[in-house]
Amino acid sequence: MSQTSNITNINELKNVLEVALLTSQAPLSLDDMTRLFSDRMERATLRMLLDELKQDWANRANPTMELVQVASGYRFQARPEYGVFLARLNPEKQAKYSRAVMETLAIIAYRQPVTRGDIEEIRGVAVNPNVMRQLQERDWIDVVGQRDVPGRPSLYATTKNFLDDLNLRSLAELPPMEDFAQQEIPLDT
């Protein structure tokens, strides 16, 4: 590869994107990736290169990794069928979440922004502060403002990290509420 940052060869452009995505600790946004190149790249061109890179990896014999888009951007990750093997590297127990935590998270995800009072009204019971703290420590929810009523209660909404952990690009990709209530969705830690 040439030493200049002005690359015109499509394969070299894809190689730069590939190495940046493979070595990044977190998903890269389109803005992050445009900064890789001295001449600002059009978003349409960048998306085309990412689509080609995704296809390149999918077309490999026995692909082990895949390029995915999540709420925070793009990242490479192991294909799901290799998860059981990778879990052996970190034999920590999968976190178990109480019914209260899962119900609270579901209410926030589907009805956001909501106050604790809204959650309590929907669930019919008081929300334990530890439930909210656990979801905030996990970086799945955050305070996004206050409702303009007496007492100005905090409004909670899900975070990009919540979407990233579920491999979702947006809340629109959540299953319909009816489906969610009928199935168990495993949440990796």
PLM-predicted stretches and their roles:
Residues 68-89, 145-168:
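Short, cationic-aromatic polyanion-contact patches
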Residues 10-26, 31, 104:
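Positively charged, polyanion-binding regions of nucleic-acid-associated proteins
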Residues 41-52, 123-140, 150-153:
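Short amphipathic alpha-helical interaction segments
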Residues 1-13, 161-189:
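Phosphate-centric recognition/catalysis
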Residues 27-36, 113-123:
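Short acidic, hydrophobic short linear motifs in intrinsically disordered regions
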Residues 20-29, 41, 110-115:
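Short capping segments at the starts of secondary-structure elements
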Residues 54-67, 139-148:
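A short, conserved structural fragment
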Residues 1-17, 76-102, 137:
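Short alpha-helical segments that sit at the start of domains
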